[in-house]
Amino acid sequence: MKRIGILTSGGDAPGMNAAIRAVTRTALANGIEVCGIRYGYAGLVAGDIFQMTSETVADKISRGGTFLYSARFPEFKEEEVQLKGIEQLKKHGIDALVVIGGDGSYHGALKLTRHGYNAIGLPGSIDNDIPYTDYTIGFDTACNTAMEAIDKIRDTATSHQRVFVVNVMGRDCGDIAMHVGVATGADAIVIPEEPYDIKEIAENLKQGFANGKKHGIVVLAEGVMDAEKFKDELLKYGDFDARANVLGHMQRGGSPTMRDRVVASEMGAYAVKLLLEGKGGLAVGMENNKLTHHDILDLFDAKHHGNYALYSLNKDLAK
């Protein structure tokens, strides 16, 4: 193996640049050349590929987003499009590939592996929704961003004795909502994986005000319901003032936390180690604080298991 490529695909996540840096410098330290591929699989097919050096990744570890840029490219599901990507890999002498992203990115990596190219997937997703890893790159930063925002929201909620329904990211996974809910002392956490009783939530909020509380915070995962709609439903059972707030894409931005930088660096270096061993078609993970890898194909039949003990814990702490 003389040259590897690296790309980021799908939604960006803080820490991706740290992973790119680790892959690049680990490969170079082992005598392997590195090519960066801009704009994910779309850039691969278009041939937007360039040589990377140690200097290319200098001063990138603290930056949010991905300096290789990203793009969603559903067309890569088609065999004809995949073959165009293969042509570009051959043209640039790329022997193997590291892909950083989520579910769609892993599907692309699997397709390339089936075409004879060793590909390794790194879990880059703020949602923490990828199986066989306790932790995805970007999750910690997103949680800290949401936590800081909710701390500020609580200030104005207290000033006006209001309830705020705060929408956080997590279409199918409530990990951000659970962690941030506990960290901010939320009155309720609402996630896709658990049933909820909106009337009960309203009653608990009313009881809180009756007991002297000056605010109410409901952390709502985006996959459950629109925040405005949830707020309106809540007001059917409560006589308090309420507002909805959608944190949105701010959770994807910002300088990555220490944890995201370190984990991304460890995963990036581990991906190169696997490629040096001639392995491919694998997804890197962090399980019980240890680096692991699994066949990418296994991920598609598996389900991410969040720390639902946090959900139960918050119910007790919010009383």
From Swiss-Prot:
Annotated residues for binding of ATP: G11, R72, F73, G102, D103, G104, S105
Disulfide-bonded cysteines: none
List of catalytic residues: D127
Pathway given in the UniProt record: Carbohydrate degradation; glycolysis; D-glyceraldehyde 3-phosphate and glycerone phosphate from D-glucose: step 3/4
Record-linked InterPro entries: ATP_PFK, ATP_PFK_prok-type, PFKA_ATP_prok, Phosphofructokinase_CS, Phosphofructokinase_dom, PKF_sf
Gene that this sequence comes from: pfkA
Activity regulation, free text: Allosterically activated by ADP and other diphosphonucleosides, and allosterically inhibited by phosphoenolpyruvate.
Binding site for substrate: S125, I126, D127, R162, M169, G170, R171, E222, R243, H249, M250, Q251, R252
Keywords (A to Z) from UniProt: Allosteric enzyme, ATP-binding, Cytoplasm, Glycolysis, Kinase, Magnesium, Metal-binding, Nucleotide-binding, Transferase
Any one GO BP annotation for this protein: fructose 1,6-bisphosphate metabolic process
A Pfam family annotated for this UniProt entry: PFK
Designated name of the protein: ATP-dependent 6-phosphofructokinase
